[in-house]
Structure formats: C-alpha cells, structure tokens
C-alpha cells in the first residue's frame, strides 16, 4: 500500500534516531518517516545534534523529501505531507512551513513553534493549502502561547488543537507520546491514506 510521508525533526541535543523511533511507535507503520538529522553538537554522540538555523533545515528537509520521492515513488501516496517537530524542530518548522503548505499540510508542534504565529500567517498557511495544526505542550508557558496561536488558526479557518500535558515539562516523554497517540485520529481526520490500526 502507498503511504503518506511524515517529516520528523528533533530538538537541540536530540537525535534523528530517537525521534524516528518515537514517531514509528506513534504512527504504527501507517506512514513513511523521513527523519531529518541535525549537526553534531560536539565530538561525543551523547552531545546530540542541532539545526544551525531554519533556512538550513528548510533546504535540507526539502532536498531529502525530493530524494525520497525520487527513490520510493511507488510507495508514497499522493497528497499532503505531515510534519512533526519537537522544540527546535517545531520552532523552525513554524518559521519555514507556511511557504510550503501546498505540500506540508498538517503539523504537530511539540514544545516549540507555539509563538511564531499570527492571524496573517495562519491565513497564509490555509491559503497555500495547510489543513490542520496540533500543538502539544508540557509547560504552561508553551500552553498559554499555543492557545493563542490555535485561536489565530481558527480565525483563519484552519482546525487547530492544543494538547496540554500538565507537568510533563519540556519533554517528549511517555505522557506526551500517549497524548499524541490519542490526538492522532483528530490530526489525520478525513485522510483516507491513514488506515485505522
């Protein structure tokens, strides 16, 4: 079966592998994952990775997506791409993805990307083809700001939802993962490419 693509980005100090494993559990073989690696933060792999800036992440993400489409065209379903970002990956996604909403239509922004929106940017996201935005927060600071951003999206005609995992902090822990799993039917609503588990 052909499957939709899910772009996955990590936070500073995180790794592409860890977030690929996380999202593989969440989507349970219902999407093709493309996990974008950052630069090494130091000589020790335990130092993790980071993205230098959003134009670099944008360039590398869409080059990787083009390569994936060229190599695995027979396995990729037509239609919009999903984007899941944590922390730095979420913030940079919010900065770069409005211009790519004709291709990347549904976003999951976890503990980042919550303060980069306005009604005008939300409207531009919708006008270019954006369909849904899920904010996930573990801190009050994130949740307060994401609540405003979700309201901006609703004003612009884009379904948006906030999942606040009170007490989880700046993490993508098991509680956050469980909340994302629970919200997945909302995120993928009306997308026939996502078969129920």
Enumerate the predicted regions with their spans.
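Alpha/beta-hydrolase-fold serine-hydrolase catalytic core, especially in secreted/extracellular enzymes
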Residues: 156-158, 188-197
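Gly/Ala-rich beta-loop-alpha elbow adjacent to hydrolase catalytic centers
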Residues: 85-89, 93
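A conserved short beta-strand
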Residues: 103-114
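Alpha/beta-hydrolase fold nucleophile elbow
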Residues: 74-86
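The feature captures the conserved acid-bearing segment of alpha/beta-hydrolase catalytic domains
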Residues: 112-185
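Conserved hydrolase catalytic core segment
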Residues: 95-105
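Alpha/beta-hydrolase-fold catalytic nucleophile elbow
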Residues: 37, 84, 110-111, 136
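Serine-hydrolase catalytic machinery in alpha/beta-hydrolase-like enzymes
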Residues: 3-76
